[in-house]
């Protein structure tokens, strides 16, 4: 009975860790509709990277502590590339066949900082002007690379 209880508890944590991802929005739509709220003016949205390396996520059934947001990846944000809506990235990415290799350039600033090559950058940049005097945002940084 103890083994069954342990397995059921473990299964609950595994199920809880799932993100649902979606790559149907443009980078500008992601910033304006997902990241910023009322009272924020957004301009100069640029994205450099693969189309499946950026999207939105629903974290309500996960343990990351953020209900929704934008996800960027050096691989794919989808665990089934070619689909627009998905059950998110699969991890851990601990073997050579578990990631998506785009063979795309990395980030020049990171390359200069670490003194080695970087690859498959997903860079989302934008300017914003808040109407108020305070800006808050939540983020989670997760990586197999750093």
Language-model region placement:
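Bacterial Sec-dependent N-terminal signal peptides
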Residues: 1-21
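Aromatic (Trp/Tyr/Phe) and Gly/Pro-enriched flexible surface segments
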Residues: 18-146
């Amino acid at each position: 009975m103890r083994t069954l209880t342990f397995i059921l508890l473990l299964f609950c944590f595994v199920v809880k860790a799932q993100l649902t991802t979606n790559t149907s929005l443009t980078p500008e739509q992601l910033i304006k509709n997902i990241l910023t709220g009322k009272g924020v003016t957004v301009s100069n949205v640029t994205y450099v990277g693969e189309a499946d390396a950026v999207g939105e996520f629903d974290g309500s059934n996960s343990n990351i502590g953020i209900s929704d947001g934008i996800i960027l990846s050096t691989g794919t944000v989808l665990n089934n590339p070619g689909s627009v809506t998905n059950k998110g990235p699969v991890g851990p990415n601990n073997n050579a066949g578990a990631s998506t290799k785009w063979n795309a350039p990395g980030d020049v600033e990171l390359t200069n900082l670490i003194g080695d090559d970087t690859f498959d950058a997903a860079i989302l940049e934008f300017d914003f002007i808040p109407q108020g005097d305070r800006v808050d945002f939540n983020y989670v940084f997760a990586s197999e690379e750093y």
